[in-house]
Amino acid sequence: MTNKNDGKDMRKNAPKGAQPGQPEPLSGSKKVKNRNHTRQKHNSSHDM
């Protein structure tokens, strides 16, 4: 019973967090990719 409840709770949270989280990860993925590119170039002089 606990497992069923846990799955239902997680499933309910997944769709709710997936909707508002989808746009964020999409934007974040692009930002991270861009950051990685800029970071690599900056890493040369801005290693740490």
Swiss-Prot record:
The keyword Magnesium does not apply. GO terms for biological process: asexual sporulation; sporulation resulting in formation of a cellular spore. The keyword Protein biosynthesis does not apply. Pfam families: SspP. Keywords: Sporulation. It is found in: Spore core. Its main location: other. Residues 1-48 are annotated as: Disordered. Residues 1-12 have a biased composition (Basic and acidic residues). Residues 30-48 have a biased composition (Basic residues). Induction: Expressed only in the forespore compartment of sporulating cells. Belongs to the SspP family. This is Small, acid-soluble spore protein P. The gene is sspP.
